[in-house]
């Protein structure tokens, strides 16, 4: 980013919406994190704006490229690619130091030599006096004030001269009007003794340089917002519009976090969830469009706005997520499902040549209404390409001696009939009539022997897709 702080446009023309997602790469990205990316991405798409990815990696000890890769992988899977970025804060240190020097020259910051021990003692006195712990301005230059002597060999921090008196007010798009008295805010450290800038300062410089118009983030950042607004205004810039999203709770009602058992977003991919189902579910986890529960990505982007963001914490419900996924599976084209299932079958040893026989889309069509994940659909599909082990309990219940002659007769009839659903159904009728049986008495054991369970879609459709040779071999195990 090359835009300087002094060159931002002040024209009256409507600004192009520019949003950002700014994760810290200190671990995997979970659903609570990714929802904080979903809404700014959706708002940028809905308004024809830009979505920027910024990696806030100033915590060098905890940040890793592996964590960045997981963030990028999760966003790519969900189809939330940024228009710009990723930008890395550690690569912008020269820019931050340039702005710090500018602020020092303007008297907006000052060096503070108070030691950690002195700060701890100050906090202890304030707490004993039942006061809010805060920096007391010992080193803040004021007219007529004598500062303490500068201690030898001590590198100072730089503190921002927070305004005295008045208040910080903003109209939050989720929380409404928020007002914080400046007297509640102490002078924030914006550079450490080694000169490295701190989070709240870097964020403001980035948001200005990247021309961010809307900051949509978790409400754990609310306390940072008045401090950031004051830095914006000290630099002569108006802050962006803020929308602070309520917390996402896990199923136990706790804040979703890695410590509380949250899973990486990519694990949901591995567990067989569709990206469009995840977007649908996450969208509803804090936003609504009337009573619509199931919608496409295109509908979401058409409908999304900031006015319908919820104010209450949303609770994750995996059973509901599976239901949403099941609805999307049913609505997904069979060819696409086949493309998604094929790699899962290949991972289980099914040769690519077998998968190219044209059956897989038809198998997906037959079973998708019974499945809530791609894993479940792949399990069904595997029956048609791999080996099958009948459920022992169902085998004992249905494959009884009394029905074995009928199974043998059906096997003979299927060996000779034309291979289509109608001919297979006719073979069943012929054997049932000859053996004096009803359909369930024969269909149930045939299902158990051929696909492993007594509960399947129409038996003639299943057998047609299984193929004559597999059926003959499996019926011989009766």
Curated annotation (Swiss-Prot):
Motif placement: 'KMSKS' region? 255-259
Is Phosphoprotein among the key words of this record? no
BP terms from Gene Ontology: glutamyl-tRNA aminoacylation
Location of motif 'HIGH' region in this chain is 23-33
Its catalytic activity? tRNA(Glu) + L-glutamate + ATP = L-glutamyl-tRNA(Glu) + AMP + diphosphate
Q: Which PANTHER family match?
A: GLUTAMATE--TRNA LIGASE, GLUTAMATE--TRNA LIGASE, MITOCHONDRIAL-RELATED
Question: Function of this protein?
Answer: Catalyzes the attachment of glutamate to tRNA(Glu) in a two-step reaction: glutamate is first activated by ATP to form Glu-AMP and then transferred to the acceptor end of tRNA(Glu).
Q: How does it assemble?
A: Monomer.
NCBIfam families hit by this protein: gltX_bact (TIGR00464)
The family classification in the record reads: Belongs to the class-I aminoacyl-tRNA synthetase family. Glutamate--tRNA ligase type 1 subfamily.
Q: What is this protein called?
A: Glutamate--tRNA ligase
Q: Which lineage?
A: Bacteria, Pseudomonadati, Pseudomonadota, Betaproteobacteria, Burkholderiales
Originating gene: gltX
């Amino acid at each position: 980013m090359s835009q300087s702080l002094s060159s931002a446009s002040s024209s009256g023309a409507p600004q192009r919406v520019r949003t950002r997602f700014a994760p810290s790469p200190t671990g995997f990205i979970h659903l609570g994190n990714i929802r904080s990316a979903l809404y700014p991405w959706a708002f940028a798409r809905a308004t024809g704006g830009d979505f920027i990815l910024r990696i806030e990696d100033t915590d060098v000890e905890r940040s890793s490229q592996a964590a960045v890769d997981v963030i990028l992988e999760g966003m790519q899977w969900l189809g939330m690619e940024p228009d710009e970025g990723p930008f890395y804060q550690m690569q912008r240190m020269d820019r931050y130091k340039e702005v710090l020097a500018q602020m020092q020259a303007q008297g907006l910051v000052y060096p503070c030599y108070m030691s950690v021990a002195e700060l701890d003692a100050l906090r202890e006195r304030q707490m004993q006096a039942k006061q809010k712990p805060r920096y007391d301005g010992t080193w803040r230059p004021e007219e007529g004030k004598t500062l303490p002597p500068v201690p030898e060999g001590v590198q100072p921090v730089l503190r921002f001269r927070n305004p005295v008196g008045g208040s910080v007010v903003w109209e939050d798009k989720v929380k409404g009007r928020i007002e914080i008295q400046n007297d509640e805010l102490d002078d924030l450290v914006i550079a450490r003794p080694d000169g490295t800038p701190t989070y709240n300062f870097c964020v403001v410089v980035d948001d200005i340089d990247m021309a961010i118009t809307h900051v949509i983030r978790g409400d754990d950042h609310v306390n940072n917002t008045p401090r950031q607004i004051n830095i914006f205004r000290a630099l002569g810039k108006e802050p962006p519009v803020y929308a602070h999203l309520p917390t996402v709770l896990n199923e136990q009602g706790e804040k979703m976090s890695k410590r509380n058992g949250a899973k990486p977003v990519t694990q949901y991919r591995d567990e067989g969830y569709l990206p469009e189902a995840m977007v649908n579910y996450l969208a509803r986890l804090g936003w609504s469009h009337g009573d619509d529960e199931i919608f496409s990505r295109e509908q979401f982007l058409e409908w999304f706005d900031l006015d319908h963001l919820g104010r209450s914490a949303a609770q994750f419900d995996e059973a509901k997520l599976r239901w949403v996924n099941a609805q999307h599976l049913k609505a997904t084209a069979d060819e696409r499902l086949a493309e998604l299932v094929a790699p899962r079958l290949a991972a289980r040893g099914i040769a690519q040549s077998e998968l190219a026989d044209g059956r897989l889309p038809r198998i997906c069509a037959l079973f998708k209404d019974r499945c809530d994940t791609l894993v479940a659909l792949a399990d069904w599909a595997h029956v048609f390409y791999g080996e099958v082990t009948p459920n022992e309990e169902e085998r004992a219940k249905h494959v009884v001696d009394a029905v074995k002659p009928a199974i043998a007769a059906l096997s003979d009839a299927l060996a000779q009939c034309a291979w289509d659903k109608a001919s297979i159904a006719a073979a069943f009728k012929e054997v049932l009539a000859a053996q004096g049986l009803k359909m369930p008495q024969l269909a149930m054991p045939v299902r158990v022997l051929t696909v492993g369970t007594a509960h399947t879609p129409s038996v003639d459709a299943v057998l047609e897709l299984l193929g004559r040779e597999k059926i003959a071999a499996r019926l011989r195990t009766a």
